[in-house]
């Protein structure tokens, strides 16, 4: 999927690029697989902001995605490749031979008319989902489960891919896009191939308004605030932050500070930390 550049007819279009959406084959989503999606503006039930920089944006409906791929042994035909406003990857509409319809994350190279299936005996080809114990070492995979039957949680965004490195005992060793090598149960399922829409990383937003369409509000730097609003605030004119290291608005160290809990239970599954 290439990206389209614009002539610099305005400051907003000078560096803006957009996807050409060449892989998209259907504009209207499948109604039976939609759910309402209410905007919160980053507020909780008390009306207080719990997530900053959220608000506004175009109205969306949630697409119900099959991350579990638990319809084993039943073949499905790819009916369409669709856009999903809730994620960077595209989604594929599957029509199963028994009449059921489901969405999955569309892997790179999947086309309308292709046949996909899940289960132990599925072929090793993009879009098929198998337990890790049935996938050959060296295979590129995505949509990986952390617990058997829970549904894929890892490697789901556009262009991402992991690799099955080894199998040892009851666990598979997987190299994730971050460079981390992690052990996952061989009973967990994964989907073959790389997530589609691989040119997503080349899209340049170009202007602030486009971020507002996405529901993302401006991020104000702490150093330009008043002392009452941020630990970096205050001072006459341009001032340094006045601390050994930057902190969040609540005084916690940030920008390079390690936030992972020490002695976390899942540490024993991580063979090599991310880069």
UniProtKB/Swiss-Prot annotation:
One of its GO terms (biological process) is cytoplasmic translation. One of its GO terms (molecular function) is structural constituent of ribosome. InterPro entries: NA-bd_OB-fold, Rib_uL2_dom2, Ribosomal_uL2, Ribosomal_uL2_bac/org-type, Ribosomal_uL2_C, Ribosomal_uL2_CS, Ribosomal_uL2_dom3, Ribosomal_uL2_RNA-bd_dom. It holds the Pfam family Ribosomal_L2_C. The keyword Ribonucleoprotein applies. Residues 264-275 have a biased composition (Basic and acidic residues). It comes from the Bacteria. One of its GO terms (cellular component) is large ribosomal subunit. Keywords: Ribonucleoprotein, Ribosomal protein, RNA-binding, rRNA-binding. Part of the 50S ribosomal subunit. Forms a bridge to the 30S subunit in the 70S ribosome. Belongs to the universal ribosomal protein uL2 family. One of the primary rRNA binding proteins. Required for association of the 30S and 50S subunits to form the 70S ribosome, for tRNA binding and peptide bond formation. It has been suggested to have peptidyltransferase activity; this is somewhat controversial. Makes several contacts with the 16S rRNA in the 70S ribosome. This is Large ribosomal subunit protein uL2. It comes from Acetivibrio thermocellus (strain ATCC 27405 / DSM 1237 / JCM 9322 / NBRC 103400 / NCIMB 10682 / NRRL B-4536 / VPI 7372) (Clostridium thermocellum).
